[in-house]
């Protein structure tokens, strides 16, 4: 079984949107924070000097992914976009997987 990044684009876009509007409660409610405390995520984003914006389609052309056979997941590394910079040097690391025909993502690192 292999997973394709295209399966997860809508849910990744939604996750980045919630980050861009500082809605960490939604991320936690959906269990997308993985082992990361949403308070820690919020603090990192708060101290980043630029404003995160929703991911454009171009971000997914630049994403790197790797299928992890043991976990049956797709680890994805995708650049954030900011209002000031466009493509940012800050990356989002996610683990993407399927559960009962639903696509799910959770933050890595």
Regions found by a protein language model. Give the residues of each.
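Short, well-structured alpha-helical interface segments that form or flank functional binding sites
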Residues: 6, 10, 22, 89
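Surface-exposed, charged secondary-structure patches
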Residues: 45-89
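Short, well-ordered alpha-helical segments enriched in acidic and aromatic residues
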Residues: 21-34
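Eukaryotic low-complexity, non-globular regulatory regions
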Residues: 1-4, 32, 43-46
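Short, low-complexity N-terminal intrinsically disordered segments enriched in polar/charged residues
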Residues: 1-17
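Central antiparallel beta-sheet cores of small beta-barrel/beta-sandwich binding domains
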Residues: 15-19, 34, 58
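Short beta-strand edge/turn micro-motifs at domain boundaries
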Residues: 87-109
């Amino acid at each position: 079984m292999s997973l394709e990044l295209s399966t997860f684009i809508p849910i990744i876009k939604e996750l980045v949107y919630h980050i861009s509007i500082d809605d960490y409660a939604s991320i936690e409610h959906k269990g997308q924070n993985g082992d990361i405390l949403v308070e820690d995520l919020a603090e990192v984003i708060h101290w980043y000097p630029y404003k995160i914006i929703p991911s454009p389609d171009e971000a997914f052309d630049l994403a790197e992914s790797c299928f992890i056979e043991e976990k049956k997941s797709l680890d994805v590394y995708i650049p954030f976009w900011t209002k000031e910079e466009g493509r940012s040097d800050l990356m989002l690391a996610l683990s993407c997987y399927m559960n009962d025909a639903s696509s799910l993502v959770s933050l890595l690192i």
